[in-house]
Amino acid sequence: MLSHLRPALVSMGLFTVLLGLAYPLAVTGVAQAAFPNQANGSLIRDADGKVVGSALIGQVFAKPEYFHGRPSAAGAGYDASASSGSNMGPLNETLIARLKTDAAALRAENPGVAIPADAVTTSGSGLDPDISPANARFQAPRVAGARGVPEKDVTALIDAQVQQPLLGFIGQPRVNVLALNRALDARYPPLASQKDG
C-alpha cells in the first residue's frame, strides 16, 4: 500500500516546495530587481521621504483647492479592503439617487457645463486613481478660484499631467489625481488660510 502512496506523497512534497516556495521567491526576486517601485506598490513620497499615497490607488481629496477623484464604491474613502464595483444595475434606485445627488452638487459648482461621466460614476474596482482630462478641466474653475490663480494656468498644468493610452491605443487618456494635486501644490501652494483647513 505504501508503494502506491509514495509517488503521490513525493509529488505533493516536491510541488509544494517548488510552487509554494521556490516559484514565489523567484518571481518576487525578479520583480524586486527589475521593477522595484511597482513591486512595492508604486508608492509616492514627499520631499522628506514620507509616503503620501500610491499611483495605483485613489484617495479622497475633499477641499475645493484640490482636484477630486472619481466616486468610490469601495467603502468610505477608497478602502482597498472593500475593493469592488457596486454591482448596481442602471435601474437600481440607490444608484440613480446617488447619481442625481452627485450631479446636482456638480451642477451647482459649474452651472451650464456638461458633467463628464467619470465625475459621477465609479470604476470597476472602486479604487481608480485616475480621472479623464475632461473631468480635470471641468474642475479647473473651482481649483483656480480656490487657489487664486488664473484658470488657464491650471488648465496648462492639467495638460502637462495627461497620460496617453498605453502603446497609443490601450485605454483612454487619463490624469492621475494624486500626481496632479502634488504638481498643483508644487506650482501653486495653497493659501495660508487653506493649509490647516
Curated annotation (Swiss-Prot):
<keyword id="KW-0406">Ion transport</keyword>
<comment type="similarity">
    <text>Belongs to the KdpC family.</text>
</comment>
<dbReference type="GO" id="GO:0005524">
    <property type="term" value="F:ATP binding"/>
</dbReference>
<comment type="subunit">
    <text>The system is composed of three essential subunits: KdpA, KdpB and KdpC.</text>
</comment>
<keyword id="KW-0812">Transmembrane</keyword>
<keyword id="KW-0067">ATP-binding</keyword>
<dbReference type="InterPro" id="IPR003820">
    <property type="entry name" value="KdpC"/>
</dbReference>
<dbReference type="GO" id="GO:0005886">
    <property type="term" value="C:plasma membrane"/>
</dbReference>
<dbReference type="GO" id="GO:0008556">
    <property type="term" value="F:P-type potassium transmembrane transporter activity"/>
</dbReference>
<keyword id="KW-1003">Cell membrane</keyword>
<keyword id="KW-0547">Nucleotide-binding</keyword>
<protein>
    <recommendedName>
        <fullName>Potassium-transporting ATPase KdpC subunit</fullName>
    </recommendedName>
</protein>
<feature type="transmembrane region" description="Helical">
    <location>
        <begin position="7"/>
        <end position="27"/>
    </location>
</feature>
<keyword id="KW-0472">Membrane</keyword>
<keyword id="KW-0633">Potassium transport</keyword>
<dbReference type="Pfam" id="PF02669">
    <property type="entry name" value="KdpC"/>
</dbReference>
<comment type="function">
    <text>Part of the high-affinity ATP-driven potassium transport (or Kdp) system, which catalyzes the hydrolysis of ATP coupled with the electrogenic transport of potassium into the cytoplasm. This subunit acts as a catalytic chaperone that increases the ATP-binding affinity of the ATP-hydrolyzing subunit KdpB by the formation of a transient KdpB/KdpC/ATP ternary complex.</text>
</comment>
<keyword id="KW-0997">Cell inner membrane</keyword>
<keyword id="KW-0813">Transport</keyword>
<keyword id="KW-1133">Transmembrane helix</keyword>
<keyword id="KW-0630">Potassium</keyword>
